[in-house]
C-alpha cells in the first residue's frame, strides 16, 4: 500500500461516519434461516432469470436420464484422444513413401527445360554442319546409346509440342466467330466510336419528328422578321432628313372632325374653349411678318450626323447614287428558289413507274438481235477477204 501523502500545517481530524449494517429482509413467517445467505440488492434475481435456470436444469436432468455419462468429460477424454491417434496412424501408414507435394512437378518442369535446351543445341549443330558443306563427311561418326535415347526424348518432346500448338491454334479465340463478333462490337462501341453518338442520333430523330408537323413555319417567320426590320442608318450616309421625308409616300388626308361625310355642306362643330385656353389666347402676341423668326429653322441634326461641304463633285456622286437606287427599286426582283422543307427531305422519293418503264424499253431497244449479229458477222468476213481487216499475229 502506498503511504498517505504528507500534509503540513494545522490538520483537523475529520469525524468518521459510522458504518451502516446490512439491511435484512424478514421472512414471511418471521423466522430467519441461518443456512441461506441474506438477500441483498446485488444477488436479487428477476423471475425471468429464475425461469430460464429452472428450464436448463430440467433439460440436464432429461439428458442424464438418457445417458448417465453425458457430462463425464474426464472419463470420455481418453476415448476421444484414442480416436484421434488412430486417424493419425492411418494417415502415416498410407504415406509410406513420404512423397513431397511439389517436388514431382518441379522435376518434370526441369526435365522439360532440359529437352528444350537439347532441341535448341541440335538445331544449332544442324546449321553449323550446313555451313561446313561436307567438309567432314569422310570422318567416322560415333553414336552412343545415351545420345540415341536423348534424340528419342527430343523427338517425343517435339511431337508433344506440335500437338499442343495445334490444339491451341484450334481453340484460339481469334478463330471463334462468336467471340470475334462480340469483340468487334465492343471495339466499335467503346473505342472506334463515341458511346454517346447513338444517344445523340436518337435525340436528333426525335427532334426531326417533332419538327415534321411544323414544316417551314419557322423559316417563314424568320423571313418576315428580316423584311420588317428597318434598315439601320449609317453615320457616313449623306442623305438628310428632308430627302427621307420627300422620298416617303404621301399620307392619306385625315378628317379634323368626328362623324361621317354627308352630302352637302359638312359643318365642323368647334369645342367650347376652357378658361385656361382663353387666357392663353388673350396673352398671345403675334410677331410681325418682317421678323427673322419666321425664317425656316434648320432641322435638328441627328446623333452621329456629320456636316460636309456641298461641293459639285459630292453633289454629283450623290445624284448618281440616288439614280442607282431608283433603278434597283424599279427592276423586278428575281424569283426566289423554293426552299425544300425538312419534312419533304425525309419523305421517300416517289418513283414514276411509267417513266421508268419507258427508260427500260429505250435501253432494251438498243440491244442487237440475232439477225443484227449475223449481218455484222458477214460484213466482218467480207472486209477480211478484201484485206481491210488484218488479223493480229
Curated annotation (Swiss-Prot):
<dbReference type="InterPro" id="IPR018612">
    <property type="entry name" value="NSRP1_N"/>
</dbReference>
<feature type="compositionally biased region" description="Low complexity">
    <location>
        <begin position="39"/>
        <end position="48"/>
    </location>
</feature>
<dbReference type="InterPro" id="IPR042816">
    <property type="entry name" value="Nsrp1"/>
</dbReference>
<feature type="coiled-coil region">
    <location>
        <begin position="76"/>
        <end position="166"/>
    </location>
</feature>
<comment type="similarity">
    <text>Belongs to the NSRP1 family.</text>
</comment>
<dbReference type="GO" id="GO:0000381">
    <property type="term" value="P:regulation of alternative mRNA splicing, via spliceosome"/>
</dbReference>
<protein>
    <recommendedName>
        <fullName>Nuclear speckle splicing regulatory protein 1 homolog</fullName>
    </recommendedName>
</protein>
<feature type="compositionally biased region" description="Basic and acidic residues">
    <location>
        <begin position="341"/>
        <end position="350"/>
    </location>
</feature>
<feature type="compositionally biased region" description="Basic and acidic residues">
    <location>
        <begin position="243"/>
        <end position="261"/>
    </location>
</feature>
<feature type="compositionally biased region" description="Basic residues">
    <location>
        <begin position="199"/>
        <end position="209"/>
    </location>
</feature>
<feature type="compositionally biased region" description="Basic and acidic residues">
    <location>
        <begin position="317"/>
        <end position="333"/>
    </location>
</feature>
<keyword id="KW-0175">Coiled coil</keyword>
<feature type="region of interest" description="Disordered">
    <location>
        <begin position="1"/>
        <end position="49"/>
    </location>
</feature>
<feature type="compositionally biased region" description="Basic and acidic residues">
    <location>
        <begin position="222"/>
        <end position="236"/>
    </location>
</feature>
<dbReference type="Pfam" id="PF09745">
    <property type="entry name" value="NSRP1_N"/>
</dbReference>
<feature type="region of interest" description="Disordered">
    <location>
        <begin position="187"/>
        <end position="350"/>
    </location>
</feature>
Amino acid at each position: 500500500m502506498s503511504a498517505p501523502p504528507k500534509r503540513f500545517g494545522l490538520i483537523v481530524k475529520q469525524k468518521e461516519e459510522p458504518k451502516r449494517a446490512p439491511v435484512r429482509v424478514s421472512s414471511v413467517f418471521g423466522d430467519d434461516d441461518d443456512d441461506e445467505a441474506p438477500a441483498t440488492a446485488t444477488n436479487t434475481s428477476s423471475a425471468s432469470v429464475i425461469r430460464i435456470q429452472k428450464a436448463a436444469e430440467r433439460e440436464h436432468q432429461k439428458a442424464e436420464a438418457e445417458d448417465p455419462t453425458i457430462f463425464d468429460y474426464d472419463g470420455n477424454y481418453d476415448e476421444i484422444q484414442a480416436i484421434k491417434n488412430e486417424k493419425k496412424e492411418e494417415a502415416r501408414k498410407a504415406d509410406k513413401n513420404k512423397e513431397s507435394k511439389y517436388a514431382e512437378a518441379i522435376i518434370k518442369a526441369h526435365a522439360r527445360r532440359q529437352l528444350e535446351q537439347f532441341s535448341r543445341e541440335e538445331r544449332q549443330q544442324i546449321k553449323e554442319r550446313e555451313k561446313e558443306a561436307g567438309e567432314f563427311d569422310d570422318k567416322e561418326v560415333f553414336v552412343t546409346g545415351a545420345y540415341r535415347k536423348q534424340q528419342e526424348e527430343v523427338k517425343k518432346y517435339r511431337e508433344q509440342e506440335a500437338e499442343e500448338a495445334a490444339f491451341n491454334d484450334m481453340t484460339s479465340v481469334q478463330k471463334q466467330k462468336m467471340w470475334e463478333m462480340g469483340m468487334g462490337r465492343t471495339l466499335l462501341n467503346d473505342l472506334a466510336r463515341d458511346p454517346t453518338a447513338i444517344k445523340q442520333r436518337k435525340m436528333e430523330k426525335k427532334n426531326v419528328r417533332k419538327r415534321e408537323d411544323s414544316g417551314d413555319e419557322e423559316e417563314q417567320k424568320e423571313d418576315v422578321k428580316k423584311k420588317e426590320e428597318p434598315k439601320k442608318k449609317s453615320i457616313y450616309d449623306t442623305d438628310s432628313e428632308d430627302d427621307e421625308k420627300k422620298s416617303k409616300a404621301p399620307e392619306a388626308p385625315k378628317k379634323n372632325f368626328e362623324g361621317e361625310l354627308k352630302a352637302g355642306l359638312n359643318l365642323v362643330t368647334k369645342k367650347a374653349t376652357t378658361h385656361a385656353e382663353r387666357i392663353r389666347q388673350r396673352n398671345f402676341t403675334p410677331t410681325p411678318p418682317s421678323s427673322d423668326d419666321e425664317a425656316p429653322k434648320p432641322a435638328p441634326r441627328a446623333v452621329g450626323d456629320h456636316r460636309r461641304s456641298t461641293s459639285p463633285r459630292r453633289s454629283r456622286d450623290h445624284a448618281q447614287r440616288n439614280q442607282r437606287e431608283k433603278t434597283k427599286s424599279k427592276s423586278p426582283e428575281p424569283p426566289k428558289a423554293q426552299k425544300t422543307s425538312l419534312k419533304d427531305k425525309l419523305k421517300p422519293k416517289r418513283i414514276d413507274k411509267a417513266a421508268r418503264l419507258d427508260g427500260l424499253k429505250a435501253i432494251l431497244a438498243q440491244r442487237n438481235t440475232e439477225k443484227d449479229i449475223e449481218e455484222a458477222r458477214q460484213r466482218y468476213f467480207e472486209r477480211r477477204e478484201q484485206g481491210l481487216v488484218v488479223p493480229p499475229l
